[in-house]
């Protein structure tokens, strides 16, 4: 029920990764990357399908060898989400996966080779209508830039990116996006700011090698939150040393928190104190697990007492405010006569949320049909 984010998106060109639009105001796409061995086709396909179930828009797959390229062909045939092939060192692998229907090629300027090899990749991409991501990383800058700057700096990452943007410009190829990732939050943020001021291509955001599930999510939320709040960014990936499914969840949570893109339930819950009239923490944890399948955007407030509960409920799709034995129930900001038994809170609230999601989905379907007519 909250208003849309007061953020003006940076203007950028539109490209397509498979059928997913990127840039020019398109919804910011959430990306992840497999961490299986690509040659293990079954494991990789299963992981991609698990990512699809939590709403991933694009999946990157590492293709380090020609054997992996052959496996990529089989993987591509068994999944629906667009796949990006991650290519390092051997440009010929990029040429091979292009034959197999890859949706985007990610190349690293620091190790893909000379301009002639890049030209070969670009010619192949153009022929097969495949976009490219120039992926600059603070940990793998070109040797001459390492010597020039001494260490990764925003200017070094920018120079690396622009060096290869200029090559693509000379080759009259504009179907590309760019990333300038670093593990240091401020280095990454400033690098993206400099790049955003120089080009109008779509930008892929990420804090590389951010860390484990908790620390990596925090770093990514800070870095990407700063950039997204400034309107910078067209796709994103949360790099975690954790299950890739968590990357997707955190990515959507960041977009949801900034009211840029909503998918599923935005839970608003108090941290609890001695005033709570029911088990808020247990209720929230249970509902988050039970309702993972809900993709309808809605705000659900679960507040343990009447201090802040009514106020939060007024701006929530569904709200509950703790009371003695029974708690108040709100729908679309309006208090209902019905009250929830505190001992049955989880089951009752789940039923109300599912019913509301179903009604909202049906209303959306009717609206779309009327517009189409």
Swiss-Prot record:
Its EC number is 1.17.7.3. Binds 1 [4Fe-4S] cluster. The keyword Amino-acid biosynthesis does not apply. It catalyses: (2E)-4-hydroxy-3-methylbut-2-enyl diphosphate + oxidized [flavodoxin] + H2O + 2 H(+) = 2-C-methyl-D-erythritol 2,4-cyclic diphosphate + reduced [flavodoxin]. InterPro entries: Dihydropteroate_synth-like_sf, Enolase-like_C_sf, IspG_bac, IspG_bac-typ, NO2/SO3_Rdtase_4Fe4S_sf. One of its GO terms (molecular function) is 4 iron, 4 sulfur cluster binding. Its cofactor is [4Fe-4S] cluster. The keyword Iron applies. Coiled coil: none annotated. Keywords: 4Fe-4S, Iron, Iron-sulfur, Isoprene biosynthesis, Metal-binding, Oxidoreductase. [4Fe-4S] cluster binds at residues 270, 273, 305, 312. It is an enzyme of class 1 (oxidoreductase). GO terms for biological process: isopentenyl diphosphate biosynthetic process, methylerythritol 4-phosphate pathway; terpenoid biosynthetic process. Pathway: Isoprenoid biosynthesis; isopentenyl diphosphate biosynthesis via DXP pathway; isopentenyl diphosphate from 1-deoxy-D-xylulose 5-phosphate: step 5/6. Converts 2C-methyl-D-erythritol 2,4-cyclodiphosphate (ME-2,4cPP) into 1-hydroxy-2-methyl-2-(E)-butenyl 4-diphosphate. Belongs to the IspG family. This is 4-hydroxy-3-methylbut-2-en-1-yl diphosphate synthase (flavodoxin). It comes from Pectobacterium carotovorum subsp. carotovorum (strain PC1).
């Amino acid at each position: 029920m909250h208003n849309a984010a007061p953020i003006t998106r940076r203007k950028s060109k539109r490209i397509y990764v498979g059928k997913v639009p990127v840039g020019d105001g398109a919804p910011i796409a959430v990306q992840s990357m497999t961490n299986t061995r690509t040659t293990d086709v079954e494991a990789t396909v299963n992981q991609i399908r698990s990512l699809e179930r939590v709403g991933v828009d694009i999946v990157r797959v590492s293709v380090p060898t020609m054997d992996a390229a052959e496996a990529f062909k089989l993987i591509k045939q068994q999944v629906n989400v667009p796949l990006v092939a991650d290519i390092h060192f051997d440009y010929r692998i990029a040429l091979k996966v292009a034959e197999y229907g890859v949706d985007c090629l990610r190349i690293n300027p620091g190790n893909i080779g000379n301009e002639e090899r890049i030209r070969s990749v670009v010619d192949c991409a153009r022929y097969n209508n495949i976009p490219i991501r120039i992926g600059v990383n603070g940990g793998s800058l070109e040797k001459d830039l390492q010597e020039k700057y001494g260490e990764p700096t925003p200017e070094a990452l920018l120079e690396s990116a622009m060096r290869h943007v200029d090559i693509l410009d000379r080759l009259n190829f504009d179907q590309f996006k760019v990333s300038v990732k670093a593990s240091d939050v401020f280095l990454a943020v400033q690098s993206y700011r400099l790049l955003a001021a120089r080009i109008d291509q779509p930008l892929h955001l990420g804090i590389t090698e951010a860390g484990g599930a908790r620390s990596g999510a925090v770093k990514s939320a800070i870095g990407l939150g700063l950039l997204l709040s400034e309107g910078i960014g067209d796709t994103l990936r949360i790099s975690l040393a954790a299950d890739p499914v968590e990357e997707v969840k955190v990515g959507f949570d960041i977009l949801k928190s900034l009211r840029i893109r909503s998918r599923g339930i935005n839970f608003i819950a108090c941290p609890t104190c001695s005033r709570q009239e029911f088990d808020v923490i247990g209720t929230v944890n249970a509902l988050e697990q039970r309702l993972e399948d809900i993709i309808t955007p809605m705000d659900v407030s679960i507040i343990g007492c009447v201090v802040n509960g009514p106020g939060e409920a007024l701006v929530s799709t569904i709200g509950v405010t703790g009371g003695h034995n029974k708690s108040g129930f709100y729908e679309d900001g309006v208090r209902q006569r019905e009250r929830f038994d505190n001992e049955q809170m989880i089951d009752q609230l789940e039923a109300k949320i599912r019913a509301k999601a179903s009604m909202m989905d049906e209303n959306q379907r009717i609206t779309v049909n009327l517009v189409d007519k």
